[in-house]
């Protein structure tokens, strides 16, 4: 069987966010690996390391009891369709948005926590 990298990439381009999330989880389980980015360990830089961060990833770690409201909040924040937003809420933990400013990340966190979600800023 020939390995066709381009065919795999083309099929990934057509997949929904929910399908890609399921694929990542299946690969993690099959190969006993983690798709999370390695965390750099800060040296003796002091407390300024956290303050110097200029972009954040908003991760929904728990969707809470009000899933419909959580899905609506994710749709409002991301602009995703219903199916993709539902996939993110159903498959927590999931990254809602990457590389946003601190103010924008805190606004998103507040909106998701309003509907019972638990959010982590990375």
Curated annotation (Swiss-Prot):
Q: InterPro entries annotated for this entry?
A: Ribosomal_bL12, Ribosomal_bL12_C, Ribosomal_bL12_C/ClpS-like, Ribosomal_bL12_oligo, Ribosomal_bL12_oligo_N_sf
> What are its GO cellular component terms?
cytosolic large ribosomal subunit
Entry's Gene Ontology BP terms: translation
Protein keywords: Ribonucleoprotein, Ribosomal protein
One Pfam family of this chain: Ribosomal_L12_N
In the record, what terms sit under GO molecular function?
mRNA binding; structural constituent of ribosome
Family per UniProt?
Answer: Belongs to the bacterial ribosomal protein bL12 family.
Q: What does this protein do?
A: Forms part of the ribosomal stalk which helps the ribosome interact with GTP-bound translation factors. Is thus essential for accurate translation.
User: Subunit structure, per the record?
Assistant: Homodimer. Part of the ribosomal stalk of the 50S ribosomal subunit. Forms a multimeric L10(L12)X complex, where L10 forms an elongated spine to which 2 to 4 L12 dimers bind in a sequential fashion. Binds GTP-bound translation factors.
Name of the protein described by the UniProt record: Large ribosomal subunit protein bL12
Q: Which organism is it from?
A: Lactiplantibacillus plantarum (strain ATCC BAA-793 / NCIMB 8826 / WCFS1)
